[in-house]
Amino acid sequence: MHVSKRWLAGLALGVFSLSAQADITVHDIEGRDVTLEKPAEHIVLAEGRQLIALSLLDTNPAHWLLGWGSDMKRSPELYDIYHKRAPELDDLPIVGDGPGPGSISVERIISMNPDAVVLSRSQIPVSQGQELMHQLDAAGIPVVFIDFATDPLDDTVPSLRALGTLLGREDQAERYIRFYEQKRQAVLDRVGQISKADRPTVMIEAHAGMGECCNSPGQGSFDYFAKRLNVDNIGADVLKGKSGRIDPEYVLTRDPEVYIATGGGYLRQVNGLVLGPDVSESEARQSLKHILERPLIGHLSAVENGRVHGLYHHLINTPLNILVLEQMAKWSYPDRFKDIDAQRTLEEINEHYISDPFMGSLWVDLKK
């Protein structure tokens, strides 16, 4: 049988084409294109909290992990959600314990030989992670950046899309993305119809009850929600960084129309605002009332008018941050967003999208 050189060349080209088609390219949150021969099967999460994002892509998110950051274990109310299904998380190796590249054990990651490492931009910016990335690249380990903390409303979709591509779970990622974008746009379209004269002043007290009043978001993070909602976050007017302390006299002078406190289970020991998946509504409301007993806060018009609210702090840096947008919209413009129901949105997420439901009190209102 005679086999022509042209036929062999065509066969080789076809095999090469199939091989090339098997490659995947992940476009990450930093605009980097990261190429892998095939979807990752085992990864390392430098920030353990990103397990929540994984749980929107797979019913058993823990099975993807070879190692993770310790932050999830420092949030027991979040850790317990996933530990119930995956007790093996107790033994999952820790690769880092905080922000900055110096907190990451490159040697431990390399010894695990993961298919990829997922870094959070808010934890390790590219500008600070060059040496870390160089070492991992030298070991043949791709690095993908995602983020849900710095600019949540803009970064959630591309971060989920990158994670979906990385793991070969594009369909699951796009399913939640469609839901997220529809909910987000429903709020933002209505905000666009609100005049500047109706723009309320809002005070956001972060980690309410931890130390003296008042810790506030400055630029970024919560303030991005405020800006997209066309509300005036009084902290952003005086704080140039991401967060800081605002002067009590300044707070009294501005006398915000709406007061939003953030907190979590980590504030129980200091009698701060307690919210989260493991918190009852009665405990959440009682803790909100307690922080209002402080002399400064108790004199605000927002308190006198009953426009006082509490929000679980850790919601903002997860793909569930759509709940933050809906709640802040309703609190800021109660007459215009009467039909917005974040509780119903949470129920939809729990029923149709996330592997392990989020229950408990994720927000609370002061009922007079």
Spans of features found by a protein language model:
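Structured C-terminal subdomain patch of bacterial secreted/periplasmic proteins
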Residues: 96-97, 151-165, 268-368
